[in-house]
Design a protein with these regions (language model features):
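Conserved phosphoryl-transfer catalytic core
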Residues: 95-122
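Conserved acidic, metal-coordinating active-site core of Asp-based
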Residues: 127-189
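Charged catalytic cores and adjacent phosphate/nucleic-acid-binding surfaces used
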Residues: 2-29, 43-81, 90-93, 172-186, ...
Length: 275
């Protein structure tokens, strides 16, 4: 069993990279990847650890971009986390998204909600703030009772306090990963709620720009969707990957390795990636 989609406190997870490794070992995984949002900060910490010889680790990232008027995510595996252009672009994206967070904070404060940057950072000024941090703060302040309520009432794309992320072209995203020596993979293709036809066209278009794989196995994918993605993966000669999309207590129903229970990502997929 492997898990190629995991988030730590370096983005919107609630466990540190070291704690992630401890959980991976406790689960007896064959291999894993850390794929924090728009940052490679956790990779060095994991590489500095004394990992078991039989545990495979592949550096990763999850980058947000835009397609068909919606936000999509592209995973990058085997990236050179020291690549200058990669880090320059990530810093630029983070600066723009930091301003987006300030804009959302201002909207909340105008309506009297006690949302501040300090509360969102929760003691870590270097954290990459996402809407999950807003949800956690809304719950901590007693404004919402759950993450689902926070997103449906305050943070969803049609909500008053939502501010879109700065546009990032998927072609540029793919090129960024490729130029950093990485393997670009479309994350959770069915989570964007495109039609089957649009999803297939998206995969086809991205393949022409350098997409190398699709995330077939994911906590949100049911067996019918997995079967469909397997079909498209073979049709377009792409790699298959999979992972839980673990975020710790921010998504408490998702566990490393097993997702919501039935998830099983075959071991050979990490070997395919590494080869």
């Amino acid at each position: 069993m492997i898990d190629l989609h995991i988030h730590s406190t370096c983005s919107d997870g609630t466990f540190t990279p070291k704690q992630i490794v401890q959980k991976v070992i406790a689960k007896g995984l064959y291999g894993f990847s850390l794929t924090d949002h728009d940052t490679v900060d956790g990779i060095l910490e994991i590489l500095a650890m004394d990992l078991p010889d039989d545990l495979k680790f592949i550096p990763g990232i999850e980058i947000s971009c835009d397609a068909l008027h919606r936000e999509i995510h592209v995973l990058g595996y085997g990236i050179n986390y020291k690549d200058q252009q990669l880090n320059h672009t990530l810093n630029m994206l983070r600066d723009k998204r930091f301003q987006r967070n300030l804009d959302m904070i201002e909207l909340f404060q105008k309506d009297g909600y006690p949302i501040t940057l300090e509360k969102l950072q929760n003691g870590d000024p270097h954290t990459v703030i996402t809407r999950a941090h807003f949800a956690r703060t809304l719950i901590a302040e007693g404004i919402c009772s759950s993450t689902d309520q926070a997103f449906s009432k305050y943070l969803g794309e049609k909500c008053k306090y939502y501010v879109p992320k700065p546009f990032f072209d998927p072609k540029d995203c793919l090129r960024l990963i490729l130029d950093a020596g990485g393997i670009p993979v479309l994350a959770h293709p069915f989570l964007y709620k495109f039609s089957n036809e649009d999803t297939k066209h998206l995969i086809q278009d991205l393949k022409e720009e350098g997409l190398a794989g699709i995330e077939v196995y994911h906590s949100s994918h049911h067996i019918g969707q997995i079967t469909k993605l397997r079909q498209w993966q073979k049709e377009y000669d792409l790699l298959a990957t999979g992972g839980s999309d673990f975020h710790g207590t921010n998504k408490p129903d998702i566990e490393i390795g097993t997702g919501r229970g039935p998830l099983f990502v075959p071991d050979h997929l990490i070997d395919d990636l590494m080869n």
